[in-house]
Amino acid sequence: MGANETKNTTILAMDVVKAIHAKLPDTHLVMHGSSSVPQDLQDIINEFGGEMPQTYGVPVEEIETGIKNGVRKVNIDTDNRMAITGAIRKVLTEKRAEFDPRAYLKPALEAMEEVCVDRFQRFNCAGQAPKIKAIPLSDMAARYASGSLDPTVH
């Protein structure tokens, strides 16, 4: 979805997600367009010269429900872009003579990091990276060729 595509809170068909997960429990689902479009980030953008119309995304609670039911990849790019944009607008408004990108990119990255840390914690993926083992491309190709990665329908 993007930041300008819905005019009210998006409620997902979690019954469908749950049904898919029940039939294909080993299949990892992806939530495209799952940014929450936080109101506080919209407010920062608009307070510092933006003209972002009132819009809504997917409530984080809905995403959390999806994760409990087989969703393994969630796209939150819009939230990150909003955090970056708001931080840059704030610096450039408050320090109008500023021209050094380091002065506005550092707070922009910090704002994005804040969004990411929040989502990593809420989505229960914080601290999980050490559990991921790198798999060589040749091994993955062999898995695909053997059919061992084909979905199992229950």
Report the location of each language-model feature:
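C-terminal alpha-helical cap/extension of soluble enzyme domains
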Residues: 58-154
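Flexible loop/turn segments at secondary-structure boundaries
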Residues: 1, 37-41, 82-84
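Glycine-rich tight-turn/loop motif centered on a GG-T
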Residues: 1-16, 47-52, 90-109
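Residue-level recognition of short, structured coil/turn motifs
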Residues: 25-26, 49, 124-128
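Alpha-helix-loop-beta-strand connector modules within alpha/beta enzyme cores
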Residues: 9-31, 35, 39-47
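Catalytic cores of alpha/beta
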Residues: 37-48, 57-68
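Hydrophobic faces of well-ordered beta-strands that scaffold small-molecule active sites
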Residues: 29-32, 52-54, 72-76
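Short, electropositive alpha-helical surface patch
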Residues: 13-19, 42-56, 89, 131-137
